[in-house]
Amino acid sequence: MVHFTAEEKSVITGLWGKVNVEETGGQAVGRLLVVYPWTQRFFDSFGNMSSPSAIMGNPKVKAHGKKVLTAFGDAVKNMDNLKGTFAKLSELHCDKLHVDPENFRLLGNMIVIILASHFGGEFTPEVQAAWQKLVAGVATALAHKYH
């Protein structure tokens, strides 16, 4: 179980309030599919993913990114119960979709990269540390049903 300090919670929620979920989610999932092309196998129904520009412009990638980051918002609201918050999604990704749990860690890193690019100097090392802790906690929670 991940424990967040009051300061970490404040830093995370403060930045989250400024995040454009649709834009950030689409960019994070798109970047995941470009940087780690083997992850594309889970998204056969998404249509044209023949090039980085096709992936980044794909409306289904953007829609899924929004869905992912909306769910990530639940983590921000429930930092003290990540495992419970993601129990159903963990089961879905493990039992039905058979997603490699390592992909959750990779996606978390993509989210951090996009946040850093969007917030520049505001995304200090302290802010990054708090967010890395959160995305790692979410990845662990999503991988829970695999154990």
Curated annotation (Swiss-Prot):
Please name the InterPro entries in this protein's record.
Globin, Globin-like_sf, Globin/Proto, Hemoglobin_b, Hemoglobin_oxygen_transport
What cystine linkages occur within this chain?
none
- A Pfam family: Globin
Going by the UniProt record, its keywords in alphabetical order are: Heme, Iron, Metal-binding, Oxygen transport, Phosphoprotein, Transport
Residues bearing PTM Phosphoserine: 51
Q: Which family does it belong to?
A: Belongs to the globin family.
GO BP annotations of the record are: cellular oxidant detoxification; hydrogen peroxide catabolic process
Instruction: Spell out the PANTHER family in the cross-references.
Output: HEMOGLOBIN FAMILY MEMBER (PTHR11442), HEMOGLOBIN SUBUNIT EPSILON (PTHR11442:SF7)
Q: Which domain of life is it from?
A: Eukaryota
Q: Mind telling me which PROSITE patterns this protein's record contains?
A: GLOBIN
Give the organism the record lists: Sus scrofa (Pig)
Q: What is the protein's name according to its record?
A: Hemoglobin subunit epsilon
GO MF, one term, reads: oxygen carrier activity
- List residues binding heme b: 64, 93
Tell me, in a sentence or two, what this protein's role is.
Answer: Hemoglobin epsilon chain is a beta-type chain found in early embryos.
Tissues and organs where the protein is expressed, per its UniProt entry: Red blood cells.
Which is one Gene Ontology cellular component term of this protein?
haptoglobin-hemoglobin complex
What CDD domains does its record include? Hb-beta-like
- Residues forming the Globin domain are 3-147
